[in-house]
């Protein structure tokens, strides 16, 4: 049985968001959402290479449906315990 873990949602895949995630994301699954999937993938790759457990998700903060999809994706991994909106 897979244990669920705390989940951090990070919106805005930039340097400020990544710095906050590096400081606050230890022990959490980090879901990185950005309007450009390439940006989310870049941050996820950097974070994963640094030992974090990170997945990228394409999302648009101006779209309610997109936000709900991001939340649903994050909930697959556990309880959302932190939201960092760095977009």
Identify the residue ranges that each predicted region occupies.
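Hydrophobic/aromatic anchor residues within beta-strands of the central parallel beta-sheet
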Residues: 54-56
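The beta1-alpha1 cofactor-binding region of Rossmann-like NAD(H)/NADP(H)-dependent oxidoreductases
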Residues: 38, 59-69
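Short, conserved SAM-binding/catalytic segment
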Residues: 43-51
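Glycine-rich phosphate-binding loop signature in dinucleotide/nucleotide-binding domains
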Residues: 73-79
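Conserved glycine-rich Rossmann-like NAD(P)H-binding loop of the short-chain dehydrogenase/reductase
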Residues: 26-43
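Conserved NAD(P)H cofactor-binding loop of Rossmann-fold oxidoreductase domains
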Residues: 86-87
């Amino acid at each position: 049985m897979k244990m669920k873990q705390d989940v951090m949602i990070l919106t805005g895949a930039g340097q400020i968001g990544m710095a906050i995630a590096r400081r606050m994301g230890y022990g959490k699954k980090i879901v990185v959402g950005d309007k450009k999937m390439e940006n989310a993938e870049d941050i996820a790759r950097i974070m994963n290479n640094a030992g974090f457990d990170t997945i990228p998700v394409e999302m648009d903060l101006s779209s309610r449906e997109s936000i709900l999809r991001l939340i649903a994706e994050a909930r697959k991994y556990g309880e959302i315990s932190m939201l960092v909106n760095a977009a």
